[in-house]
Amino acid sequence: MEKLQGHRELDRSWQHNFFYPLIFQEYIYVFAYDHALNKLILLENAIAKKSSLLIVKRLITRMYQQNHFILSVNDSNQNEIFGHKHKKNLYSQMITEGFAVIVEIPFSLLLISSLEGKEIVESQNLRSIHSIFPFLEDKFLHLNYVLDILIPYPAHLEILVQTLRYWLKDASSLHLLRYFLYEYRNWNSLIRPKESISPFSKRNRRLFLFLYNLLVYEYESLFVILRKQSSYLRSTSFGALLERIHFYGKLKYLVKVKVKVFGVILWLFKEPFLHYVRYQGKCLLASKGTSFLMYKWKYYFIAFWQCHFSVWSQPRRIYINQLSNYSLDFMGFISNVGLNSSVIRSQMLENSFLVDNIIKKFDTIVPIIPLVGSLAKAKFCNGLGHPISKSVWTDLSDADIIDRFGRICRNLSHYYSGSSRKKSLYRIKYILRLSCARTLSRKHKSTVRAFLKRLGSEFLEEFFTEEEKVLSLILPRDSSTLSGFYRGRVWYLDIICIHNLANDE
């Protein structure tokens, strides 16, 4: 524990103690509501020690002068139109956005200082969420078991404050953070939405997302330290009987450690084939070991969260599965390791025989049912997947309607381009194309057939990606290269987030 605590304090030696005055900076709130600004400008301004109480007074005055009559019909607690409650919530929300920008500053400064003096070429490929799948294709084929883990979140809000206290020793800011956390007691639903990850999920609030990522960073930083020293304890007298199948393969990883407390010698086996992947609130831990070792890792995680962070994780949130007969629901894909059989005829002299080769393949499948459900929720189709018109878009121009449908279709094609089976993706594109045609025909009070006959192929080209347009111009329709492109798997390394497509209005 002394080593872990020393490592945590070493990383936080750069920390800044006074960020509370930044709340009085007007550019903080401008940046919070205009994400197109350059973050470097914010960091440069953060260094300048200029603050004005008059700026905040003006901001509060403008917030109170805004129209507060736009309220949610479904929220009965917000129906006090002439009361003070809605104004208070609006004020808290705006200050929360500014506070989120402030607490992000020290971490941005840490990133800049760590890159100084290092020749590191910035690459979007390293940030792409699609870069995870080539890694899975390369590693998971040689592994046996996987832990499917839902990362727990703290039941008590004070744990979040204590986590940030290691990084930001500003009592005023921490008290303000407590106020925001208790103001939004339903933060669990903001951080971890109940619906599965999809391109149609709503964006989370900035402050709560930051706090959640900080908490996960604390989990992972300590986990990496323990992983470097991690091993599986073996008793000396029973060392020869443990994992006899893999004994000779792991003999070189055998080390001898003397434990001072008990005065005995323990044997440790390091696990060389252990891979960890995380996206949002879900992580995967895959290993080449046996199921017994994975059970040890499972209860190790439970004890790790409970002892170090006072976070209780139920065992049913961690599943142990064998990769050969399990499908992973990860990042909007259904992934599994399948076995493909190929028969090869071999001939030696006058004798010929058939050889059956079994090849492992990592498949990624488009989850058609959740996607159709998301389209139905966004009013592009009904619950059975039959396209319907988007009535709320009929007031737009024809070009805007086609552009919106086409952009959603292209983004989906872009994200699910690495799918092993494109039939489900073709169905989604069909729903969007026909929904667009029904929307336009409803606007012009015409039939879908007459509308498609009038526009022709120009209407369909709006739903193609740029790669499909270029290849369709260069290659003929019956070309094997073009058909191979539609069937092949392509991972785009420029995707850094899943966009909110349903509410793109």
From Swiss-Prot:
InterPro entries: Domain_X, Maturase_MatK, Maturase_MatK_N. GO terms for biological process: mRNA processing; RNA splicing; tRNA processing. Keywords: Chloroplast, mRNA processing, Plastid, RNA-binding, tRNA processing. The keyword Transmembrane helix does not apply. One of its GO terms (cellular component) is chloroplast. It is found in: Plastid, Chloroplast. GO terms for molecular function: RNA binding. It comes from the Eukaryota. HAMAP family: MatK. Usually encoded in the trnK tRNA gene intron. Probably assists in splicing its own and other chloroplast group II introns. Belongs to the intron maturase 2 family. MatK subfamily. This is Maturase K. It comes from Amaranthus greggii (Gregg's amaranth). The gene is matK.
